[in-house]
């Protein structure tokens, strides 16, 4: 998808440093939850960290990855497992980028997450609060991040499709 955005921007004379958007190029969730992967994990992670590097240099407003817990939850995990697997995937991507020589203080501020929300209102709120604290702790304690923006757990939430019911005409009586 990023290549398409780049091609269109070049065709229309738009500088890459003006582009903004988000990729959900989270290959590890495909292995865990969906089974729709094409390439093995190692080359897939290399491609992802290559995108981190390319965006770091050429597209500074681009959110380099949206790491998905949504699909993991829809595949049957608990909310605790959703966070655990999502952050395990995130740690893998961050470690790979650091091993490539990238600075987590810089690229870390453009990582985002995609979480699921089920019907347990208070439990879900607690999960989101815990996610913010856990991610900040992971970035600070494990990777030595000091940039406050790179410590933020930025995320999008969507209603879990598995919590929706089929049409039931008596629900609104």
Protein language model features and the residues they cover:
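Thiamine diphosphate
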Residues: 3-6, 162-173
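Short alpha-helical functional segments enriched in proximate histidine and acidic residues
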Residues: 138
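Catalytic alpha/beta active-site cores
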Residues: 1-124, 142-145, 149-158
